[in-house]
């Protein structure tokens, strides 16, 4: 589900349609793999569990679109509201499918069609295809970056930042050059207010603990795991890194994915 467009689909049956579609894809997989020896295990699992994994992208884009800082109470409100809705509507759709097509073996008597309905994937390619929206639940790594595509390398600008700079009359080559020299950051731009700078913080400028806290908040609505990356400064002591992992575990986060950083030499440049 594209959270950047949440306000456009929140009052529709989009989540229900997505679950219906995923369940139909699973049925096609079961049908087409009948008699395939090498996929017997996968087919049997699909038949017994009918596990789905509806995910999201565009989380950070929604926040920036609405000028909400990632590290804010408003962000946590949206986080809870969006994922609670997706969970409730996913479960409702699975119940409807069970009434129509029946329950799989492992869910007999539970009134559900699918053992799981949600999983948060990385979506790097999908987010690029869908208008350069932010990947999954992850913040943008930069407000100005080079995208390597099949036909060459192209510079990409944060569209919501570009709109803001245009309103302030500073959407020009020199401004973007300074953003590039500051590794995609806008914290040096004196024309922006503190609130605006907070909205356009990059991944490395957002507290890893805030990433973990919001992941823990939404985990209660997600029956599977989240593709959750952390951006940790190379200068952070090992004990502090360890503390982040322990806190994630204590807060109920099921998994952590990449621990991103940069070399000390690059950070000193």
What function would you assign to each model-found segment?
Residues 1-23, 55:
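Internal glycine-rich alpha/beta core junctions
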Residues 6-11, 42-48, 146-147:
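A ubiquitous short alpha-helical element
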Residues 6-15, 67-74, 156, 173:
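Structural helix-adjacent loops and short alpha-helical linkers that scaffold large soluble proteins
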Residues 17-43, 47, 51, 63-123, ...:
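Internal maturation/activation junctions in enzymes
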Residues 23-34, 118-269:
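Catalytic alpha/beta core of large soluble enzyme barrels
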Residues 51-58, 125, 157:
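Catalytic-loop motifs flanking and including active-site residues across diverse enzymes
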Residues 55-58, 90-94, 241:
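Extended, hydrophobic alpha-helical segments in both membrane/secreted and soluble proteins
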Residues 58-62, 78, 160-164:
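A general alpha-helix detector
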């Amino acid at each position: 589900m594209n959270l950047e467009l949440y306000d456009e689909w929140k009052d529709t049956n989009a989540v229900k349609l997505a679950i219906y579609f995923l369940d139909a894809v699973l049925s096609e997989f079961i049908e087409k793999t009948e008699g395939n020896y090498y996929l017997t295990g996968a087919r049997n699992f699909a038949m017994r569990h009918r596990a789905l994994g509806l995910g999201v992208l565009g989380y950070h884009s929604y926040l920036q679109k609405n000028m909400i800082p990632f590290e804010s109470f408003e962000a946590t409100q949206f986080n809870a509201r969006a994922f609670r809705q997706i969970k409730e509507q996913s479960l409702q759709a699975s119940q409807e499918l069970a009434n129509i097509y029946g329950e799989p073996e492992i869910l007999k008597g539970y009134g559900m069609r699918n053992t799981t309905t949600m999983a948060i994937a990385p979506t790097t390619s999908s987010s690029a295809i869908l208008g350069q929206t932010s990947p999954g639940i992850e913040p943008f790594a930069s407000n100005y970056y080079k995208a390597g595509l099949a036909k060459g390398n192209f510079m990409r600008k944060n569209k919501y930042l570009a709109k803001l700079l245009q309103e302030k009359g500073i959407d020009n080559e020199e401004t973007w050059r300074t953003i590039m020299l500051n590794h995609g950051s806008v914290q040096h731009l004196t024309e922006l207010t503190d609130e605006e700078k907070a909205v356009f913080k990059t991944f490395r400028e957002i507290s890893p603990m805030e990433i973990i806290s919001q992941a823990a908040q939404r985990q209660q609505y997600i029956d599977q795991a989240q593709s959750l990356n952390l951006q940790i400064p190379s200068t952070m002591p090992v004990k502090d890194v360890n503390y982040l992992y322990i806190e994630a575990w204590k807060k109920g986060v099921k998994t952590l994915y990449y621990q991103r950083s940069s070399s000390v030499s690059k950070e000193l440049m």
